[in-house]
Amino acid sequence: LEKYTEQAGLTDSYSISGLPTAKGSFDFDGITDGQLGWAGVGQYHDQVNPAALMIYMGAIANGGKAAEPYLILRTESALGLPSLPHFTTRTGRLISSDTASALADLMANNVTQTYGASRFPNMDLCAKSGTAEVGEGQTPHAWFAGFLRGEDTPYAFVVLVENGGGGSSVAGT
């Protein structure tokens, strides 16, 4: 798990339009088998920066390599016409193409079977919700991360609601 989190970029600091992100961390020192199991589902001493998770979602969407994100300053050209961003720079391989394909299929099934595709009309969405515990007596953070499949909508995303409660019911609506 430690090797995978490093290779997948989940502990990296990324530069987004020149702005550095905080590194993620996983604590594997002296970990028991039970704690390793919890770490594997994000419920031990795991800290993942939302930007790193978004890049990981992009890697799943694109066969193992992600587009490098940047800030979108405007969505129209100087003439006032719609202009969607073009992502031309890619990361190195974060995960294998087989793993990316399997995860994409699982995430698509998750949307259909768990959240209901009707919540996301006209979208080929692959996503997973999560709840991040933040400390004793504090309301957990709600996560919803994924991507849109399709040539005309090649976008990965992360929604994080700090102290929002549970996963998709908060961050996935």
Task: Name each model feature, range by range.
Residues 6, 172-173:
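Residues within alpha-helical segments
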Residues 1-162:
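Beta-lactam-recognizing serine transpeptidase/beta-lactamase-like catalytic domain environment
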Residues 53, 167-172:
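Short, charged, low-complexity patches
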